[in-house]
Amino acid sequence: MIIKVIPVGPIAVNCSVVADEKSGEAIIIDPGAEAEKILEAVKDFKVVGIVATHGHIDHVGQVGKLKELFDVPFYMNPLDKFLINDEIWSGFASYIGAVPCPEPDVEISEGDVIRVGDVEFKVLHTPGHTPGLCCLYEEKRRVLIAGDLLFKGSVGRWDLPGGNLVELKKSVKRVLTELPQDTLVICGHYDETTIGQERAFNPFAGELLNG
């Protein structure tokens, strides 16, 4: 498995390109901005799908352009369809260069599997930041693409459209307790981390794990 993490746009969304070395197939996850940078990252692969961890515009801002270029299915949880063309803040779509986002071709939910050659991502429905946020977990290689659920030393916001603090706490606790401590966590913004590091040092973890 090859993973390229490309920070895109003015708020540095982590777009991930995940490829299978044998087949040369790849998926694009959270293409929020700067389609040109993403195209450069996938130039040696055959793109077979586009996935959004959730529907906030900074994570889906280039889905429309890339779907048109590659003619591949777009995967997202349907609970976030109401968000995909919501600016959040006035002028934000223009600020990040977002284009209109289509509705998902494939509606993903808990327990689904997204395959890219030999790579298998299990879908974990982890609401709270948004109703439909889904993490993608590659069990064999212990990699979690967490979207905006969990960050290094922090957690996702719950005060944006679709946010729910009660659900967020449940979802963060779930990944911190169910996944192996050496799981690599690729966050929706900022640096990568591990489940073990967040269990030990994330200031939100103590309350969640001991409460």
Swiss-Prot record:
Keywords: Hydrolase, Metal-binding, Zinc
EC number: 3.-.-.-
GO MF terms, alphabetically ordered: hydrolase activity; metal ion binding
Note accompanying the cofactor annotation: Binds 2 Zn(2+) ions per subunit.
Assigned protein family: Belongs to the metallo-beta-lactamase superfamily. Glyoxalase II family.
Highest taxon of the lineage: Bacteria
SMART domains in the cross-refs: Lactamase_B (SM00849)
Pfam name, any one: Lactamase_B
Cofactor entry: Zn(2+)
Binding site for Zn(2+) 2: D58, H59, D148, H189
Keyword flag Transmembrane: no
UniProt-recorded name of the protein: Uncharacterized protein aq_2135
